[in-house]
């Protein structure tokens, strides 16, 4: 009774400018570019509908549930300054729409279906506000920043790493040799490249064994705890877990996962294992630029960073600001804070659309990696501070005297910059002089 078939504008149901958002709502900020002739209110409402309870036509089963309780809402729209016919649409989703502890379900709902919508020329998810009522259902980082420092017994400075190069083609024994030389020279970590899994030239078990030998030899010689990010990423979750188990049996302190290519479900499963078994979890963001590089379409990395903090990871690559890969300083610092801090205020100048309260969820160490070397050390120390991992691949292995001297150069430069900063010197102005003094 009362059902009337037909198609009606989305905005009649899903555009609600008077809606007062709730503390438990998941809030989203979408940058949308509607097709010519499509009003922004209709476009915003269409996104809200298609990412929650709506479809293209009225259906009689709408009468069997409460749309007011379950529907997403577009509650505000603002034009983007300097952009023609581009808008920020603010959406609110009731918490009941999402499975607890599942980034997979969260993304399937909010971004799973709306990006190919005809009414839109382009759509980009700029930010999400995750309420504590939802974030508390996630595992979060297996250990977090403070526990990692306690495990490693390393405080008061950035951690230093190196990606072993060439990334593909080395035998397991030569790979282990490069690991040993870098760790002996003073680095805290070495790293499998993201596409090092288990290829014909170097099967994963052989690599793990030679790396473990290098790890323990370097530890014995330096008296410091060392780590190598053993990449457990595999074609199946079962194989991934087998590799993580073997890493634990070898006594390795940390494993690695490519969380976007491996998937959120696999990542969360690995995070649970790492927490239960005392392994740190390093996360690489391979494939992120496919999703986040276009300014008008896709998902901003700050959203992927929040998703990773919930799904689970102790480190994640976060750009460098100064190296070979793209990254704007203020925006990068915005999502670095979203990774590390407990409470982050809304700050549009840094791309943060919503205040985010992580409550007691541990933080994630941002990893600066990609085209950096010792002359970048003052800027990196100033930009990222102590709670970070600075990772020099070619910046270590490209040293003219070899791998170990390259590692020594990075360690000396880092400690010189930290000491100079602690003495009150201006790293931005005096950085080159500080590095030259350290070389003597």
From Swiss-Prot:
Residue numbers binding Mg(2+): 191, 193-194
The keyword Transcription regulation belongs to this UniProt entry's keyword annotation: no
Protein localization: Plastid, Chloroplast
InterPro entries linked to this entry: RuBisCO, RuBisCo_large_chain_AS, RuBisCO_lsu_C, RuBisCO_lsu_C_sf, RuBisCO_lsu_fd_N, RuBisCO_lsu_N_sf, RuBisCO_lsuI
Cofactor requirements of the protein: Mg(2+)
Post-translational modification: The disulfide bond which can form in the large chain dimeric partners within the hexadecamer appears to be associated with oxidative stress and protein turnover.
Keywords: Calvin cycle, Carbon dioxide fixation, Chloroplast, Disulfide bond, Lyase, Magnesium, Metal-binding, Methylation, Monooxygenase, Oxidoreductase, Photorespiration, Photosynthesis, Plastid
Taxonomic superkingdom: Eukaryota
GO BP field: photorespiration; reductive pentose-phosphate cycle
UniProt GO molecular function: magnesium ion binding; monooxygenase activity; ribulose-bisphosphate carboxylase activity
Amino acids binding substrate: 113, 163, 167, 285, 317, 369
PROSITE patterns registered for this protein in UniProt: RUBISCO_LARGE
Reactions catalysed according to its record: 2 (2R)-3-phosphoglycerate + 2 H(+) = D-ribulose 1,5-bisphosphate + CO2 + H2O; D-ribulose 1,5-bisphosphate + O2 = 2-phosphoglycolate + (2R)-3-phosphoglycerate + 2 H(+)
Location of the active site: 165 (proton acceptor), 284 (proton acceptor)
EC number: 4.1.1.39
Function: RuBisCO catalyzes two reactions: the carboxylation of D-ribulose 1,5-bisphosphate, the primary event in carbon dioxide fixation, as well as the oxidative fragmentation of the pentose substrate in the photorespiration process. Both reactions occur simultaneously and in competition at the same active site.
More details: The basic functional RuBisCO is composed of a large chain homodimer in a 'head-to-tail' conformation. In form I RuBisCO this homodimer is arranged in a barrel-like tetramer with the small subunits forming a tetrameric 'cap' on each end of the 'barrel'.
Family: Belongs to the RuBisCO large chain family. Type I subfamily.
Name this polypeptide is given: Ribulose bisphosphate carboxylase large chain
Source organism per UniProt: Dicksonia antarctica (Australian tree fern)
Gene this chain is encoded by: rbcL
């Amino acid at each position: 009774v009362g059902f009337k078939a037909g198609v009606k504008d989305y905005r009649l149901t899903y555009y609600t400018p008077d809606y007062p958002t709730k503390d438990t709502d998941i809030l989203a900020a979408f940058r949308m570019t509607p097709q010519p002739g499509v009003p922004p209110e209709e476009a915003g409402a269409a996104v809200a509908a298609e990412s929650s309870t709506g479809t293209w036509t009225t259906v009689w089963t709408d009468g069997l549930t409460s749309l007011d309780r379950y529907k997403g809402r577009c509650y505000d729209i603002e034009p983007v300054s300097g952009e023609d016919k581009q808008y920020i649409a603010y959406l609110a989703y009731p918490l009941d729409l999402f499975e607890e502890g599942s980034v997979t379900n969260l993304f399937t709902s909010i971004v799973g279906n709306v990006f190919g919508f005809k009414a839109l020329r382009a759509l980009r998810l700029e930010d999400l506000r995750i309420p504590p009522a939802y974030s508390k259902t996630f595992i979060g980082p297996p250990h977090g920043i403070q526990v990692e420092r306690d495990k490693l017994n390393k405080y008061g400075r950035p951690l230093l790493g190196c990606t072993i190069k060439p990334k593909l083609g080395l035998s397991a024994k030569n790979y282990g040799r490069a690991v040993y030389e870098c760790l002996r020279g003073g680095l805290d970590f070495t790293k499998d490249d993201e596409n090092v899994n288990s290829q014909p030239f170097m099967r994963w078990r052989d690599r793990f064994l030679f790396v473990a030998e290098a790890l323990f030899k370097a530890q014995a010689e330096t008296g410091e705890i060392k780590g190598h990010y053993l990449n457990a990423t595999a074609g199946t979750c079962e194989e991934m877990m087998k590799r993580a188990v073997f890493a634990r049996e070898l006594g390795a302190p940390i494993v690695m996962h490519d969380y976007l290519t491996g998937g959120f479900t696999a990542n969360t499963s690995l995070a649970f294992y790492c927490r239960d078994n005392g392994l740190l979890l390093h996360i690489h963001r391979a494939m992120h630029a496919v999703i986040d590089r276009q300014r008008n379409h896709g998902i901003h990395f700050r959203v992927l960073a929040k998703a990773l903090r919930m799904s689970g990871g102790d480190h994640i690559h976060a750009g460098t600001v100064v190296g070979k890969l793209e990254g704007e300083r203020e925006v990068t610092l915005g999502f670095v804070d979203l990774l590390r801090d407990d409470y982050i205020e809304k700050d549009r100048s840094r791309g943060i659309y919503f205040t985010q309260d992580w409550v007691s969820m541990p933080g994630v160490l941002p990893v600066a990696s990609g085209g950096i070397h010792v002359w970048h050390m003052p800027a990196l120390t100033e930009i990222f501070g102590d709670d970070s991992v600075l990772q020099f691949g070619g910046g270590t292995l490209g040293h003219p005297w070899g791998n170990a001297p390259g590692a020594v150069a990075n360690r000396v430069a880092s400690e010189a910059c930290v000491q100079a900063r602690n003495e009150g010197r201006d790293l931005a102005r005096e950085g080159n002089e500080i590095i030259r003094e350290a070389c003597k």
